[in-house]
Every structure is written in structure tokens, then in C-alpha cells.
Amino acid sequence: WDALHAFRMRLLRLSPAAFIHFGTTRELRALMTEDVKQYAFLDWKRCVLGRASERYALNNAVVEHGCEIGADCYLEDSYVLEQSRVGAGAVLSHVTVRDREVPADVALHGLRLCDGRFVVRVYGAGDNPKEATFLGEPLARLGEWPSLWEAEIYPVCGTLEQAVDAALNLYALARGEGDRAAWETAERTSLRASFNAADTRFILDWEASLRETAQAEALLE
């Protein structure tokens, strides 16, 4: 009471409304690609601010003609350009994918760090950051860390597109392929450290700029 008595409080009842909880990438993907139908009464749609499709869901994303997007993907705040191909069930967030192939059932999440550099975090849609697994395999193949959250496996790069390539190389390494020497010599960060070092002002500006592009594209369709 000592802390709150000076403030007025008001109860607002929103209608129509629904409480929606999701805590994992897999749950987010399911919500946006399938469960969204249950919230039609809230005017929710699979595609908002972007080219509509019955195959995938998006929110504030630009997908150029010529790109192939697999079934049940979720794209947010991203550009998919040129001849890119995105595998089924992939989740893209805050990335630019230009003429690249994104594997199925992975998440690519881009961040600009406060020092102006970029990192793209790649992981399996079903991965649990609290566990020592990566893309469904033991994390020990890459190094000794207690969990994916703490694992310093994500290269820090000068540009976002370089960071996308580094993330795809990391995916290849987990599959026994890729350029391990390039990964080992790169400065790397973790999910935890990159989260704490994210440039939030840049993220908001990125989303606003992309929103303008998506709106302009919609007018030209």
C-alpha cells in the first residue's frame, strides 16, 4: 500500500478478447499457422502486412515473386528475396534472406547488437534452450556448455546477410558438413549474451521501415 496508494487504478474489460499464451517457437508457429483460425472473432488472420498465402503465415514480411515458401512457415519482420527457398515449418524473424535456402523446421532470428554488428541465431523449431541439445542433436558435438541458452555458437558478423550465411553454415556443421574452420575462428556469442546486447532501437526502426515497404507492396499488388 505504501508504494501504490498514490496511484489510481482502473479496471478495463476488453471485449471481444482472449488470453493467449505461447512459450516456445513451436507453439508460436502453431498459433500463427493453425490455431489462428480459432481467433477469427478477433479478426486475426494468417497473413498481416504481406502477400497472403494459404500455405504459410506472415506478419510484416516481404516475399518477392520467385521465392518458394514451404507449408506452415511463419515469417515475421523479414525480407525473403530473389530465388530464396524456405523449407516447410521454418520460422524467420528479423532477417533478410537473399537467394538462399533455409532448411525445414528451423528458426532464424536476427539481431543487431549495440556495437553495430549482427548475429543470426539458428535452432530447431523443437529445441529447448534449457537443454544441451541443438537441432535435436547433442550440443557436445560443438562444445561443452550446460545448455543451448549459454552456448557460444553464433558467429558475430559485420552485416546481417553475412550473419545469415554464418547461421546456415552452423546448421550445416550440425549435420556433419559446413566450414568448421570458419566457425571456430569467428567471434561467437550465445542466445543469452546476444539477447542482452540487442540494439532495441534498431529493432523498432527495422520493423517500422519494413512495415512501410510491405504497405507499399500491397498497394502495388
Stretches with model-predicted labels:
Residues 1-221:
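Left-handed beta-helix
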